[in-house]
């Protein structure tokens, strides 16, 4: 049970890191503020360091890791691009990053609870990843804005059997 939970927890961290790095990559070209840019790059570098640690452990268990859920990755890409089209600003990027980090923290805590039998090293990596996400949220708070232009309601409907996606904005 320990080995099984350890592998499952490491795989979820692996997928989460890949999702986080991809999300940062999606927005870096749009960041205007140099401090904000450096903050995101530093966070990405820290994610990459944790990814290396995870890969070493996954290799030890002869596991290839896990890719992010394609649906989640696609929805994230759509949300990012729609919001940036509506308002290409550091405030929008900070809002997107904050939402992503909060979702990551929530998911990682659920996995810690779910895979209680995982070894301490994998739990430690998960906790460090959670702290990294929480730190980014704190570091970018100054870029958040309450401006009306930065917030809009949106609703996504998908019909995926025939690969059709309809996006409604209001």
Language-model region placement:
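Membrane-interacting alpha-helical segments
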Residues: 1-7, 61, 147
């Amino acid at each position: 049970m320990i080995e099984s939970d350890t592998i499952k927890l490491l795989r979820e961290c692996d997928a989460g890191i890949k999702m986080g790095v991809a999300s940062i990559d999606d927005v870096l070209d749009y960041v205007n503020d140099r401090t904000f840019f450096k903050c995101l790059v530093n966070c990405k570098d820290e994610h990459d360091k944790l990814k290396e640690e995870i890969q070493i452990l996954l290799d030890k268990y002869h596991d290839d890791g896990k890719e992010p859920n394609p649906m989640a990755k696609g929805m994230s890409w759509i949300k990012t691009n729609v919001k940036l089209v509506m308002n290409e600003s550091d405030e929008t990027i900070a809002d997107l990053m904050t939402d992503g980090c909060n979702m990551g923290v929530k998911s990682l805590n659920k996995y810690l609870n779910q895979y209680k039998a995982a070894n301490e090293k994998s739990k430690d990596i998960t906790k460090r990843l959670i702290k990294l996400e929480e730190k980014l949220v704190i570091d970018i708070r100054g870029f958040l804005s309450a401006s009306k232009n930065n917030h809009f309601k949106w609703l996504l409907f998908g019909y995926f059997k025939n690969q059709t996606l309809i996006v409604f904005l209001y």
